[in-house]
Amino acid sequence: PFGNWMVLKRMVIFIAGWPTYWRIAIANKLKIEGLEHLKDLPNTNVFFISNHQTYFADVISFYHIFCNLKWGFGKKLMPIYLFSPRATIYYVAAKETMKSGLIPKLFSLAGAILVERSWRAEGVNVKREVDTSAGDNVTMGLKSGWVISFPQGTTSPYAPVRKGTSHIILSNRPVVVPVVINGFRRA
């Protein structure tokens, strides 16, 4: 599979999963709708397209939901899934965000596909060439499992969708699953 060793990914998901489970499932009472649409998806070439409200809670919630789905627990998150998580999950993330500290670096081991943003760096608008290797890495992720993308490329609401997403869809023809995240700004 693409990315880090599966054993390492499973360990990171297990370690990060326990404290985040409490926050997501107990304190904030994550509400999941539309889970029935995910049950019969193939194990590879599935592309989740989502809005982005926080730096990490969105992705962590996806991991909890997908691992829970693997075990067949339905809408109620049961942390036993952390003992054998779905490890073929990948997510597109800004390289600068994932290199900014120990916790982001740890999370990146769980399946980050790092992208060098062409329009923004360290909070400042920039103009640089598009990172063409990012599309290749997303393709490898799709061949190995499920990929989560936040095509707005920012946590700002109503930002335009970046063009790379359409290129990935056209070249890979994945199953595309649109996702709406709501409420993390209040969490």
Predicted features by range, described:
Residues 1-5:
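A short, surface-exposed helix-loop junction/capping segment
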Residues 6-25, 104, 108:
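Short hydrophobic helices that act as membrane-entry/anchoring signals
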Residues 26-187:
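Soluble catalytic domains of membrane acyltransferases
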